[in-house]
A protein has these predicted regions:
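Short, charged, surface-exposed loops that flank catalytic or proteolytic processing sites
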Residues: 47-60
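Loop/turn elements at helix/coil->beta-strand transitions in domains of secreted/extracellular proteins
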Residues: 23-26, 53, 69-71
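Extracellular/periplasmic periplasmic-binding protein-like sensory domains
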Residues: 1-36, 48, 104-126
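Short catalytic/ligand-gating loop segments at beta-alpha or beta-beta junctions
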Residues: 29-38, 58, 71-79
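Solvent-exposed, acidic/polar segments of extracytosolic/periplasmic ligand-binding ectodomains
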Residues: 65-127
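Short glycine/serine- and small hydrophobic-enriched flexible loop segments
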Residues: 40-48
């Protein structure tokens, strides 16, 4: 997980995962990065808005957000629709683990996001 926070550039995606696990005692969940990114987008929009108290100004500012953060680059200026950004996904599988948790998520396909390294081989799930 090579990405870093736009709110705290010293915080990597791996550190976010580790912090979540140490502070909650629970295994991290796949949505933690995209949930974090909601706050990154909000900060970018509120900062760019002519008046952060004006809903219309904030909504318009979202259309101009183009930043790199916890989920990589999110560009709301390019679509697929105005004000919408697409996260470049990776394919994952939960694999048996010898660590603290019984299973751990491993990246098995990075064809749409080459910045994230492959961590395991894709295995059939119906075997």
């Amino acid at each position: 997980m090579p990405n870093k926070s736009s709110l705290d550039p010293s915080l990597s995606a791996s550190q976010l995962k580790d912090n979540f696990q140490s502070q909650t005692g629970n295994q991290w969940v796949q949505s933690i990065g995209s949930t974090y990114s909601l706050f990154e987008v909000a900060k970018a929009a509120f900062t760019a808005a002519s008046d952060p108290h004006d809903k219309a100004a904030v909504a318009q500012a979202i259309h101009n957000v183009n930043y790199t953060g916890m989920c990589g680059t999110l560009d709301f200026t390019q679509g697929p629709a105005p004000g919408v950004a697409i996260i470049n996904p990776v394919g994952v599988q939960w694999k048996q683990s010898s660590g603290k948790y019984q299973f751990e998520m491993k990246v098995v396909d990075n064809s749409l996001n080459k910045n994230v390294p492959i961590g395991a081989k894709l295995e059939p799930t119906n075997a």
